[in-house]
Amino acid sequence: MPVPPPPPPPLPPPPPPLGAPPPPPPPGPPISTDAPSLRKSDLKGRSALLADIQQGTRLRKVTQINDRSAPQIESSKGTSKEGGAAGSNARGGSTPPALGDLFAGGFPVLRPAGQRDVAGGKTGQGPGSRAPSPRLPTKAISGPLPAPASPRLGNASDTHSSARPVPPRPSVPAPPPPTTPPPPPPPPPPPPPPPLPPASPIKAPSVSPPVPPTKGNPSAVPAPIPCVPPLPPPPPTPPPLPPASALSEKAVRPQLAPLHLPPIPPPLPLLPPYGYPALHSEPSSPAQDVREPPAPPPPPPPPPPPPPPPLPTYASCSPRAAVAPPPPPLPGSSNSGSETPPPLPPKSPSFQTQKALPTPPGAPGPQIILQKKRRGPGAGGGKLNPPPAPPARSPTTELSSKTQQPGGQLRNGGQHVIDDFESKFTFHSMEDFPPPDEYKPGQKIYPSKVPRSRTPGSWLQAEAAGQSSDDIKTRNSQLSLKALR
């Protein structure tokens, strides 16, 4: 390292011949005035460097200069011997060289990305202005004779060096355009993402359409209709079906009101219509499961009161219904009980399994959920009117869907936060539970009741007194009985 210091002294003289080109840049003249002016010029140079660096890959040349910047540190040391010039070089030269080393190490490689131009420009300014100075001596070392250059000459050399980098930069801008084009490529990537969203909607419809054909394969819609015609009221009920389906898609709450109104005159039609919206709503998308759950619970309450008279008619139609729409027959079978033959419930699950197989993977989940919803609410609705009824139905529901209950209940619990527990789950009647243990009054001593005494043996005395006191026992027993009741 001691060898490089000698070459720096010749550096100041060569710049004068090169002074002709530098004059065009404005920063040159102010630099020669004073040290503060040097700082201002440095700021201006930084702005220019930032603009130039943003334009293109100028730092690649800087990398070459930065490789030679190591001697520049010694040059600052050597000039320090000279005098005033040392201050200017030491201020700017002490920090930038390290940055120059860092730039030489990794920054130029990262530059091409075009993202760090601004950050690199701020830090790279110092090395950029300082680095060219070594290059000048290398070119004009032939004239090292005037080695004893005054500090002003050194300043002039700095001015020329700072101005010198500017000419090479104009030559460099040619490469910058290639770097600027890369930014345009990034914009094209954003357009590809938009196509993706369209693809997702396409996927959603693709999932939904296959479901309806599967539903259409079994003659679910036509079969129950013949069962309904015999009744006089059914004609008014079919019109509500389409609005119900539309409402189920839009908002379930409005649907509940129309369902409650029509069911009173024709209880039977309510079940098939109630099944239809479910079928229509299922194909729409599994995402609507959240909306569907609230709909089923309210309708079930109306069916329980009328079931006895209409059940036989519905039972007569139940064979077709059981084959066509699986969900409606299940509640019908559970309600009819002895009226319908036992094999019907097994048929419905078998058909459900067949139906679940053709449907896409997303469909079977909602079907199971809907089935559970209809069963659970039916049992809950029955429980609302007569408490003893639910226990009779609960075993049927449990037998018909042992495997489906746990998952369905969990899913319903996650989805129905608004509904009551009775609509979600099947509960046992009070008779099913064993009676609570009889209350047997015993000796109870409460410290608050005991007379306060500062003697240490007060507790023992209190216990003895409590055992003999019957009034406290009777009070405690009465209070506890009231609390239990």
Swiss-Prot record:
UniProt GO cellular component terms: cytosol; early endosome; recycling endosome; synapse; WASH complex
Induction: By aldosterone, corticosterone and RU28362 in hippocampus. By corticosterone and RU28362 in cortex. The response to corticosterone is slow. Does not respond to vibratory stress. May be regulated by both the mineralocorticoid receptor and glucocorticoid receptor.
UniProt entry keywords in alphabetical sequence: Actin-binding, Cytoplasm, Developmental protein, Differentiation, Methylation, Phosphoprotein, Spermatogenesis
Gene Ontology molecular function terms on file: actin binding; alpha-tubulin binding; gamma-tubulin binding; SH3 domain binding
Comp. bias regions, Pro residues: 1-30, 165-200, 207-243, 260-275, 293-312
Pfam families: WH2
Classification via CDD domains: WH2_WAS_WASL-2_3
Main location: cytoplasm
GO biological process: Arp2/3 complex-mediated actin nucleation; cell differentiation; endocytic recycling; exocytosis; retrograde transport, endosome to Golgi; spermatogenesis
Domain WH2: 45-62
In-chain residues carrying the UniProt-annotated modification Asymmetric dimethylarginine: 46
Region (Disordered): 1-485
Expression sites (tissue/organ): Detected mainly in brain and at lower levels in heart and lung (at protein level). Also detected in testis but not in kidney, liver or spleen.
Biased segments, Basic and acidic residues type: 417-441
Placement of sequence motif RLRK: 58-61
Motif WASP-binding motif positions after renumbering to this chain: 426-450
Keyword Cytoplasm: yes
Residue numbers carrying Phosphoserine: 150, 208, 394
SMART domains (UniProt xref): WH2 (SM00246)
Cytoplasm as UniProt keyword: yes
Subcellular location: Cytoplasm
Complex and partners: Isoform 1 interacts with WASL (via WH1 domain), and monomeric and filamentous actin.
Domain notes: The WH2 domain is found in a number of putative actin-binding proteins. The profilin-binding motif has been implicated in the interaction with profilin and SH3 domains.
PANTHER family: CXYORF1, WAS_WASL-INTERACTING PROTEIN FAMILY MEMBER 3
Family to which the UniProt record says this protein belongs: Belongs to the verprolin family.
Protein's UniProt name: WAS/WASL-interacting protein family member 3
